[in-house]
Amino acid sequence: MKLNRCNPAHLRVTEVALAVFFTLSVPVAVARIVDSRGQSSGGVCEDIYRRYNEDHILCRQPESACQPVASGVEGADKDIILAAHNRYRSQIATGNNSSFPHASNMLEMEWDDDLARVAQAHANLCSNQPSCSSCMRIEKFPHVGRTGCLIRTDSENNTADWEGCIGYMYKESLRIPTTSSNTPLRTMRGVESFTQLAWATTWKVGCGYVKYPSGSALRFEKLYTCAYGPGGNVRGEEVYKVGPACTDCPEGTCCGESCQQYNITPSYSGLCKVVDDGPIFPLDDEDNLLFRCLFNKATSQSCNFQSDPSDGWKTKTFFASTGHAESVLEAGQSAEMTFEQPIKSSHGRLCIEVEYNKGPNVAGTLDRGLFELLVTPVVRPQRQRTINLSGGAINTMRMRITLHYNFDVKIGFSFIVPRGSPAQYVNIHKVLIYEKACPERYRHALD
């Protein structure tokens, strides 16, 4: 590539002893790492996982003391896992056997092999310690959620009890104080497994299982792990929208009678079933939205951009609703991109919202990439303005910036890696431009 140069709670279970639940809440302890050519608990440690976190689940090795007697998720178990998740989600959405408000936008979950690989890699570590979000991140889901449980037992039975494990997750809801029928539910400490199970916009799940000898009084431990995409338990966000079931299903889904046009018979009452290449989620305040680019199929036309050099940026689309623009540069290189569509506000105020990750291409090395927002007047390009966008080496960042222009401008981005620096990357997930001032200018980590 030619580039420019520049200067939980404890409870008794019927199987025998103890069930422990965990979610993504506390950084995991340091484990042994293998290089990109080595074998890990999940197979080959690919370079992209070494980018996300130097302690990524797919780059760890299990302790030598871990000697599984059973592991993996069979086809029949996948059906049980999906049925249990969707049955509980349906109960919440419709208000059947649930003390919570009805959910208007609850998606039906589907199996995902990539998430299952991550979940199995975690289970293979034979450790119930919680792990960080970036430790389980995969390319198509920047934020991956996780739940699971650990059961200690004397039983020789190697069969996984997924119904029991997922049922215990649901029972965490008993700890949530009773609220009115119109009060939105938010994540809270001690019930994160339940709120991830009930997170409306999560629609992919994959799980892993392992049974191994225990160092405790009981002879064996059974470790269950599930990974979710997109992950839930996002601070400040509602678990689901309150309202009659099916009334807020996103584009690309059907629910109830609306599924007849797709010749689909719904399996679960009140759940929005994906009928295409993933749901397309609505954006906030669409009435004031001048420009949207999520680098996905739904916004592909508005995402057209010019890259300098031509191979400095590339786009990747994973589902109808998700994708990103990416630049990976070595020391002394730079690249710019500029959206082709000019933007103008009728009253001179623009709010630009950018969601991104940036950092070293190998986690643990220096974060030296300079990522900037470019605002270029169409008639006076020499008056270009640059705004630094920092952070994001581990977390997905969201920046909102208010601009004041009463003439056409073009929006773009610049990425520069100084000489002597390790390789750096940036992923831009979302660019939204509103015809209004932002509520505030801030930088916010999403996970």
Task: Locate predicted features.
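Mature extracellular or exoplasmic CAP/SCP-family domains and secreted bioactive peptides
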Residues: 15, 27-329, 333-338, 362-372, ...
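Short, conserved beta-strand segments of beta-strand-rich sandwich/propeller modules, principally
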Residues: 204, 351, 408-412
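Solvent-exposed strand-to-loop "edge" motifs in beta-rich extracellular domains
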Residues: 342-344, 355-361, 416
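Extracellular carbohydrate recognition and processing domains
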Residues: 377-409
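Short beta-strand-plus-loop segments that form exposed binding edges in beta-rich domains
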Residues: 413-422
